[in-house]
Design a protein with these regions (language model features):
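N-terminal "pre-motor" subdomain/linker immediately upstream of P-loop NTPase catalytic cores
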Residues: 1-93
Length: 93
Protein backbone atom coordinates (compact mmCIF):
# COMPACT_ATOMS: atom_id res chain seq x y z
CA UNK A 1 0.00 0.00 0.00
CA UNK A 2 1.38 3.40 -0.94
CA UNK A 3 0.86 5.66 2.07
CA UNK A 4 2.44 8.79 0.61
CA UNK A 5 -0.65 9.95 -1.36
CA UNK A 6 -2.51 9.95 1.95
CA UNK A 7 -0.01 12.49 3.30
CA UNK A 8 -0.94 14.76 0.40
CA UNK A 9 -4.63 14.27 1.24
CA UNK A 10 -3.90 15.17 4.85
CA UNK A 11 -2.26 18.43 3.81
CA UNK A 12 -5.09 19.28 1.38
CA UNK A 13 -7.78 18.59 4.01
CA UNK A 14 -5.76 20.08 6.88
CA UNK A 15 -5.97 16.79 8.74
CA UNK A 16 -3.97 16.41 11.93
CA UNK A 17 -3.82 12.61 12.08
CA UNK A 18 -3.95 9.52 9.89
CA UNK A 19 -5.00 6.20 11.42
CA UNK A 20 -4.53 2.64 10.19
CA UNK A 21 -6.04 -0.31 12.03
CA UNK A 22 -6.80 -3.84 10.88
CA UNK A 23 -10.38 -4.57 9.81
CA UNK A 24 -11.20 -0.86 9.31
CA UNK A 25 -10.68 1.72 6.57
CA UNK A 26 -7.87 4.28 6.84
CA UNK A 27 -9.13 7.35 8.70
CA UNK A 28 -8.08 10.98 9.02
CA UNK A 29 -8.80 13.48 11.78
CA UNK A 30 -10.00 16.93 10.72
CA UNK A 31 -10.98 19.52 13.33
CA UNK A 32 -11.28 16.81 15.96
CA UNK A 33 -13.55 14.60 13.85
CA UNK A 34 -12.35 11.21 12.63
CA UNK A 35 -13.60 10.17 9.21
CA UNK A 36 -12.78 7.35 6.79
CA UNK A 37 -10.59 8.08 3.77
CA UNK A 38 -12.44 5.45 1.75
CA UNK A 39 -14.48 2.29 2.31
CA UNK A 40 -11.61 -0.18 1.87
CA UNK A 41 -11.24 -2.29 5.02
CA UNK A 42 -7.52 -2.76 5.65
CA UNK A 43 -6.27 -6.25 6.39
CA UNK A 44 -3.62 -6.83 9.06
CA UNK A 45 -1.12 -7.48 6.25
CA UNK A 46 -1.98 -4.14 4.57
CA UNK A 47 -1.51 -2.22 7.83
CA UNK A 48 1.82 -3.91 8.53
CA UNK A 49 3.06 -3.26 4.99
CA UNK A 50 2.01 0.41 5.17
CA UNK A 51 3.99 0.84 8.39
CA UNK A 52 7.06 -0.98 7.10
CA UNK A 53 7.01 1.11 3.91
CA UNK A 54 7.71 4.21 6.01
CA UNK A 55 10.61 2.75 8.02
CA UNK A 56 14.27 2.57 7.19
CA UNK A 57 16.27 -0.58 8.01
CA UNK A 58 17.31 0.57 11.49
CA UNK A 59 13.75 1.60 12.39
CA UNK A 60 12.42 -1.75 11.21
CA UNK A 61 14.96 -3.55 13.40
CA UNK A 62 13.91 -1.42 16.40
CA UNK A 63 10.22 -2.07 15.72
CA UNK A 64 10.78 -5.81 15.36
CA UNK A 65 12.63 -5.87 18.69
CA UNK A 66 10.45 -3.46 20.71
CA UNK A 67 7.05 -4.02 19.00
CA UNK A 68 6.49 -0.25 18.97
CA UNK A 69 8.20 2.72 17.36
CA UNK A 70 7.89 6.50 17.21
CA UNK A 71 9.63 8.29 14.35
CA UNK A 72 9.21 11.14 11.88
CA UNK A 73 9.45 11.29 8.12
CA UNK A 74 9.73 14.25 5.78
CA UNK A 75 7.97 14.36 2.45
CA UNK A 76 9.35 16.98 0.04
CA UNK A 77 6.75 19.60 -0.76
CA UNK A 78 4.35 18.33 1.91
CA UNK A 79 6.03 18.54 5.29
CA UNK A 80 7.11 16.45 8.22
CA UNK A 81 4.93 13.71 9.66
CA UNK A 82 5.18 12.00 13.03
CA UNK A 83 4.54 8.25 13.00
CA UNK A 84 3.59 5.93 15.87
CA UNK A 85 3.45 2.20 15.13
CA UNK A 86 2.62 -0.46 17.70
CA UNK A 87 1.26 -3.96 18.18
CA UNK A 88 -2.30 -4.25 19.44
CA UNK A 89 -4.09 -7.57 19.87
CA UNK A 90 -1.44 -9.33 17.82
CA UNK A 91 -1.61 -6.94 14.85
CA UNK A 92 0.27 -3.82 13.77
CA UNK A 93 -1.65 -0.56 14.24
Amino acid sequence: MNVKPLFKLMVEKKASDLFFAPFAPAKIKIDGKIMPVNKLEMTPKMVKQAAIELMDEEQLEDFTRELELDFAISEPGLGRFRVNVFHQRGNVS
